[in-house]
């Protein structure tokens, strides 16, 4: 009987692919029409049961009241575009003559935003998403996958069986076990669970697959699902941890702060966890929350643009309801309004227009940068890095079941064997590197506590919470409440008169007055007096309090700990997964990566109308009163080391150790690591996918390094450089102040400042 009954245009089931027409129900419709009786149930063009007539009442839904129609002009525009871009052959243009992928262009984007003609959706969705190319390039056919996944005894198969009738119970194609769509949905979901064993079965995929089966043939629907899992959404979106979609909820929250600040303030005031509502929107790509007509328009753009559309659509929805949310009286009202937003959106054009207005400038690069950061934070927050470093490798790529075709010996020799055991050994190496770094940090911390007892109260436990990362920049911005300006004595100065301030080498003097260029007034041990300015060195205490334990000119042991223990452990982490040079040779050192990443990060501000030191970036001030971001500080540090060390022909190892010393002095070593790891193009260029810097593991290293920011270092970046000849020939310091001493006897000194 298949194909015997055809739905009437615009009538029930008319929008479905032909093979999904439920012949038993269509047969009843035909019989009812002949007997002039009302059918038992009414169905819309998508096969969903309609309980009552809709469209006549003033408050009726536009989506239900207006049938799905195809705009002839829009179809002509699509045909013209396809003919113009694929007019390689003379004659009628058919789908087999159109490329498997459609090159992105402004024209194509505008066409997609305006909507794809419904009759063209199956072919265009496959091409826009890349599913057709995936289908044609696959080593295994859908039949092979179906044959391998037909086992009823697997855990995934049993879970799928439980959910088959729960997925879309109000649709005639999935309402009972005899419905035409149920066996198709079973095979598609089993095939996905078999092809992606790391994911298995996720309930979120069921709703998406069922919607696709309404409009695409079974095999095409399967490859569309494979494309969504592998290409359109991030890794781990559908696995048991849902860490991918959880990460996107944090990214969404970040975007709301940027694009909808009033709504952000409202959510914070009422302590509403938005992800409780929106996670399901993302997991099902809106399939479970919006009307099918609206879903088709969202999916048109989703298959063209990818997961970026999920963010833009959500922001558009929230913007449309922002005023209503702000006027809500309490938390319960806000939560309910947020939950009801998707079901209240009725006009796709209005939604997409609002989405483009508020977030049209949002790009995939911006989203990926935030994803990388928040994924690392999320995993560190959950403690997974401490317990299972193997989980990190699984987040970099979805493992697809492959056909059993072995690599040749030459291929293995040239490109290596990235099997599970190899990844496992790399994860073991990661654990050892973290342990070495942690021990080096503890050695430095114990040195501070032993040498300078005031450090004994410092907590040495790393803080892995999400809040700790938010506080990092706040701590960086805020300077010490103590506004004292202090200096360290470079040599002994004996007191002869009552108005002189005597001190010994390395004493810490509080400066009272610097009015005179040569003679300053200071205080030490309750006594005030003048002293030669050249006899002291101003301490950098913008955000720290000087400690003798961290001064390499006073305490020799700190040099060995920093340059001999800590720096090598940090270098080992930067060397982990560093890509080796080609067979032709070439340098391969973390310093080269740091140089390039620092330059790339700071270049983003070069084209600004203002200087890259503009005050709108309210970070710490340097000695010239300019404002420096962590990126700028890193860039300056790298340039400073290059200038001083290149003149001495120093090796890159020495440069790296000196830069680490600068980072410790400025208490920004952990922030510099974040800057470097956030430079995605540079990291991907220099490091393997399994490396520490390309995995979420870097955030644990950041948390470990943050412990060092609790201590005050005064390290010389030039410690390993040879002493310059002019420095050797310089006159003793005391000889340089004879004129100043004469000046002391000629003038009176205002000791009280």
From Swiss-Prot:
Domain SH3: 482-541
Domain RUN: 557-720
Pfam families to which the protein is assigned, alphabetical: RabGAP-TBC (PF00566), RUN (PF02759), SH3_1 (PF00018)
Limits of the Rab-GAP TBC domain: 115-306
Stored CDD domains: RUN_SGSM3 (cd17688), SH3_SGSM3 (cd11813)
Source species, domain of life: Eukaryota
Keywords for the protein's UniProt record, in alphabetical order: SH3 domain
MF-aspect GO terms: GTPase activator activity; small GTPase binding
Family to which this protein belongs: Belongs to the small G protein signaling modulator family.
Protein name as annotated: Small G protein signaling modulator 3 homolog
Species this chain originates from: Xenopus laevis
The gene coding this protein: sgsm3
């Amino acid at each position: 009987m298949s194909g015997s009954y055809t739905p009437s245009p615009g009538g029930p089931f008319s929008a479905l692919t032909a093979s999904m027409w439920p012949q038993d129900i269509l047969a009843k419709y035909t019989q009812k029409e002949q007997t002039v009786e009302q059918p038992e149930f009414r169905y819309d063009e998508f096969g969903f049961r309609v309980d009552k007539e809709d469209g006549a009442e003033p408050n009726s839904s536009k989506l239900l009241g207006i049938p799905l129609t195809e705009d002839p002009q829009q179809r002509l525009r699509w045909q013209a575009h396809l003919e113009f871009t694929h007019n390689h052959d003379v004659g009628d243009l058919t789908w087999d003559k159109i490329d498997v992928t459609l090159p992105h262009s402004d024209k194509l984007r505008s066409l997609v935003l305006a909507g794809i003609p419904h009759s063209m959706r199956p072919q265009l969705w496959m091409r826009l998403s890349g599913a057709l190319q995936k289908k044609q390039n696959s080593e295994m056919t859908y039949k092979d996958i179906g044959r391998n996944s037909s086992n009823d005894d697997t855990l995934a198969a049993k879970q799928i069986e439980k959910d088959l009738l729960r997925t879309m119970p109000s649709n005639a194609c999935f309402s009972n076990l005899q419905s035409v769509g149920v066996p198709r949905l079973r095979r598609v979901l089993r095939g996905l669970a078999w092809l992606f064993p790391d994911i298995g079965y996720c309930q979120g995929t069921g709703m998406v697959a069922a919607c696709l089966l309404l409009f695409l043939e079974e095999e095409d629907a399967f490859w569309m699902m494979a494309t969504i899992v592998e290409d359109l959404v991030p890794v781990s979106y559908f696995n048991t941890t849902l860490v991918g979609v959880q990460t996107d909820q944090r990214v969404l929250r970040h975007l709301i702060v940027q694009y909808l600040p009033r709504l952000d303030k409202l959510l914070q005031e009422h302590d509403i966890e938005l992800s409780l509502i929106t996670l399901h929107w993302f997991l099902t790509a809106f399939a479970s929350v919006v009307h099918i007509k609206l879903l088709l328009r969202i999916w048109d753009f989703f298959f063209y643009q990818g997961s970026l559309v999920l963010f833009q659509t959500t922001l558009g929805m929230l913007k449309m309801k922002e005023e209503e949310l702000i006027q809500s009286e309490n938390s319960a009202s806000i939560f309910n309004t947020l939950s009801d937003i998707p079901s209240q959106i009725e006009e796709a054009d209005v939604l997409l227009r609002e989405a483009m207005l508020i977030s049209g400038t949002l790009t995939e690069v911006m989203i990926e940068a935030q994803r990388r950061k928040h994924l690392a934070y999320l995993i560190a927050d959950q403690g997974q890095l401490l317990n299972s470093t193997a989980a990190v490798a699984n987040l970099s790529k979805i493992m697809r079941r492959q056909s059993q075709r072995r690599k040749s010996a030459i291929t293995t020799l040239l490109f290596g064997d990235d099997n599970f055991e190899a990844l496992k050994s790399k994860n073991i190496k990661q654990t050892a590197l973290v342990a070495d770094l942690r021990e080096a940090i503890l050695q430095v911390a114990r040195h501070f506590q032993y040498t300078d007892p005031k450090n004994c109260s410092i907590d040495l436990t790393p803080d892995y919470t999400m809040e700790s990362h938010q506080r990092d920049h706040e701590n960086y911005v805020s300077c010490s409440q103590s506004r004292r300006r202090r200096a360290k004595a470079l040599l002994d100065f004996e007191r002869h008169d009552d108005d002189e301030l005597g001190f010994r080498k390395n004493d810490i003097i509080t400066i009272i007055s610097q009015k005179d260029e040569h003679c300053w007034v200071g205080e030490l041990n309750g006594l005030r007096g003048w002293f030669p300015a050249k006899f002291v060195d101003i301490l950098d205490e913008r955000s720290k309090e000087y400690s003798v334990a961290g001064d390499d000119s006073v305490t020799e042991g700190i040099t060995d700990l920093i340059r001999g223990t800590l720096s090598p452990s940090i270098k080992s982490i930067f060397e982990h997964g560093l890509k080796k040079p080609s067979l032709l040779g070439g340098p391969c050192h973390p310093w080269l990566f740091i140089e390039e990443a620092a330059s790339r990060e700071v270049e983003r501000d070069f084209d600004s109308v203002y200087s890259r030191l503009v005050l709108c970036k309210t970070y710490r001030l340097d000695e010239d009163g300019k404002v420096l971001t962590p990126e700028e500080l890193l860039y300056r540090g790298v340039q400073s080391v290059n200038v001083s060390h290149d003149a001495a022909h120093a090796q890159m190892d020495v440069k790296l150790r000196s830069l680490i010393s600068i980072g410790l002095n400025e208490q920004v070593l952990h922030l510099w690591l974040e800057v470097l790891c956030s430079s995605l193009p540079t990291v991907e260029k220099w490091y393997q996918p399994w490396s520490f810097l390309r995995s979420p593991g870097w955030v644990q290293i950041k948390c470990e390094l943050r412990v060092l920011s609790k201590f005050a270092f005064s390290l010389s970046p030039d410690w390993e450089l040879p002493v310059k000849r002019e420095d050797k020939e310089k006159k003793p310091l005391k000889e340089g102040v004879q004129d100043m001493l004469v000046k002391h006897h000629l003038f009176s000194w205002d000791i009280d400042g």
